[in-house]
UniProtKB/Swiss-Prot annotation:
Residues 1-189 are annotated as: Microtubule-binding. Residues 107-131, 821-928 are annotated as: Disordered. It comes from Xenopus tropicalis (Western clawed frog). The lineage of its organism: Eukaryota, Metazoa, Chordata, Craniata, Vertebrata. The gene is eml4. It holds the Pfam family HELP. Its main location: cytoplasm. Residues 867-876 have a biased composition (Acidic residues). This is Echinoderm microtubule-associated protein-like 4. PANTHER family: ECHINODERM MICROTUBULE-ASSOCIATED PROTEIN-LIKE 4, WD-40 REPEAT PROTEIN.
Amino acid sequence: MDGFAGSLDDSVSAASTSDVQDRLSALELRVQQQEDEITVLKAALADVLRRLAISEDQVATVRKAVPSKGPATMREALSMSCITNGGAGTRKPSHITSVAKKDTLSSAAKSVKRSSTIEKSHNSWDASEESRNKLMRAASTSKLTSKVAKATDKHKDIVISPEGEYIKMFMRGRPITMFIPSDVENYDDIRTELPPEKLKLEWVFGYRGRDCRANVYLLPTGEIVYFIASVVVLFNYEERTQRHYLGHTDCVKCIAVHPDKIRIATGQIAGVDKDGRPLQPHVRVWDSVSLSTLQVIGLGTFERGVGCLAFSKADSGVHLSVIDDSNEHMLTVWDWQKKSKIAEIKTTNEVVLTVEFHPTDACTIVTCGKSHIFFWTWSGNSLARKQGIFGKYEKPKFVQCLAFLANGDVLAGDSGGVMLIWSKTTVESTASKGAKVLGVYQISRQIKAHDGSVFTLCQMRNGMLLTGGGKDRKVIMWDHDLNPEREIEVPDQYGTIRAVAEGKGDQFLIGTSRNFILRGTFNDGFQVEVQGHTDELWGLATHPFKDLLLTCAQDKQVCLWNSVDHSLEWTRVLDEPGHCADFHPTGTVVAIGTHSGRWFVLDAETRDLVSIHTDGNEQLSVMRYSVDGALLAVGSHDNFIYLYNVSENGRKYSRYGKCTGHSSYITHLDWSPDNQYIMSNSGDYEILYWDIPSGCKLIRNRSDCKDINWATYTCVLGFQVFGVWPEGSDGTDINALVRSHNRKVIALADDFCKVHLFQYPCSKPKAPSHKYSAHSSHVTNVSFTHKDSHLISTGGKDMSIMQWRLIEKVSHSQNDNIVESSSAVNSPVVTEKPLQPNTPTNLPQAVNEVPKEDDKTPAESPVPAEDALEQPEELNEVQSEKCSSQPEGANGQEPSNEVSEDPTDSAAINNTPEDAQDENQDDSSPLS
């Protein structure tokens, strides 16, 4: 019986194995058939695309034969024929084409499948001549697709109605209809040019201390040098002036000062421009007096970014050592004046935090980082590594910083709060007994210095030493024998210490993790010199009649800044991150929207909480008071606009109504001058109009609103502004837009780190603009000050606030004798002057308060001599959005405010392992 059962099992097993093999064979056959079908489908698609391209070429030929100034009806008919044939230069036709392709593929697949089912035994695709021809056509599919795309681009991006009543632009295939105002007699006669106004960077608020180290220094000019975004700032705290080096194309990450204290090297990270082209990391060496670029080093050499760098000291700064952020953390040594790389070697796969040349031994370079300290012997083009041996001493998780004692010993601070002294000793060679080997560094002494990490070391001119602690936030002064003499603790609200530098006299400078720069002494404590936000920044509002601006960010801080003396008036921490803000027309209160649907009203003078409300549970994207201040509109990500009655000069609020009709979240909105209507944009490119007195009703006939002269213009979609959109935009490239109060220009914040200045109105596609670089992440907001004298822009991830001065270019003939130039005898001379507003900003009639005399903006100061002439090419802007080139070094003098290529929208701001650390992390971290 058992034998019978065993034989039965064997037979069942054999049968199941045979069944599995049959199924595998069937599946293999099916896969082969499907691959054959795909090949045929590719060939069919190639044929369709080729026919489409031929059709496009024919349409283009017909268009060339038609006069450009023909009747509007003929132009519209031609445009519609292009759309019918799939060749319009808009995205909608291409979307239709893609649907057609899917239908073609589907029918072809069914046909092929039926054929393959009937004639399975006769399938020999790969051997037939027809198959080879089809494969060749399929291989050329990508080329044909490219050709079709190019042919499509030849056609105009907009469609004008036959009657000239409206224009349609397309965004991601969706039509956006904009009605032409009545005062436009002929749309073809509209001309959009570059505005005469330009921008000049005047002030930068903020400092990058959260994820950087050793990036604050005092120069002989009395200026503090530091960086934020792609700007290196030189700040004279006594005279309250700033100068800016603008040569970088993305986030500046590290800085080194030459032994002569004049020349400076700064390194940046990699990025990508708006066209997807890489922005290579590099080091720029520049003159801190003239702000001219002396050399650009490392293009094509560094990966990801420049992590740290240092000038040599023993040879008076002839050489520069750089460590990049690649996996191997490559160490390179450069003769920077010759722009030549002398030596290169891999250091370690672990984090490297610091590199330094030995001040007296020109052949020694020291690097340190996670669980290591390396001593490099440099000879010619070779680098030899000797690892620091901790021996009986506990090996730290991180060696954080380096300094050098007068006797040549190396001093290192570690994550355990210990200072290690490494002395050069002689040891006995293991190869031959009795032989002595010089140059081995060993720990000769250790000193417990701080609770938590020793984050930074600063060797002072008098031989004393300053150390900065991470966790304990203490600055300690040590004498020549490394005995502690004095100490002081940085208050908790400023964060932990990131950088320590020697100041004037007995002063010292501190950079902190909460983006403060402090100046202090052991006797008098600290004074704040620089401060900024510590997280992503979106909210911005300018005061209606004072030189004040308000910002709010993810760090929950609300800050009121003075744009004249560039100081912080007050700051308040909310319960939630702020995202948008607007001042009441009286200027007495400001409304702030948050990420949770709650919004706060604060007293603009005392920062006291006046009111708090909640609308929905999603992010509020825009707050906008009506012109008379009687209504407040709140745009939300729940697709609604909430309306509130406002009384008592902005101190009392009651729900008025709700605008319902958008199919996506609200992005921007504006009021009409009579407070009757609202224009709004949404995330799916809608332009809707609302009748507020009639119960917040949606106006169905949008042409009724075409002649409204909106009190403000912040909507990014509309007839007066649609020309600002770049070609091929997906609808998210523009974050904010604002029209100046004098209605002359439009400022724009984009996703490619740029601030643009357009002429207003801007009703032609691909309008030209002045383009400015300073931010290193998406620019989130822009706003003009009340007299249009300045523009404020905010950066997202870079957390910076930029204040730009509007400059009006005025041309003069040579006979005016303003400036004599031997190089341009017959050319006009161009001078800069601050832009003066044509009309004062008037308060609404409902406002009873009148600004005091001392609240008015002081007269503009004279233009400095160095600003009196415009260069042959404006180096801090690019007037065409089409050009983008890699930065090039200059052997001679290169102006510092050049625009290199477009900076990246850098999510890579925190792209190194230490960047992701929080300021309250464990002491074992390199940033604790």
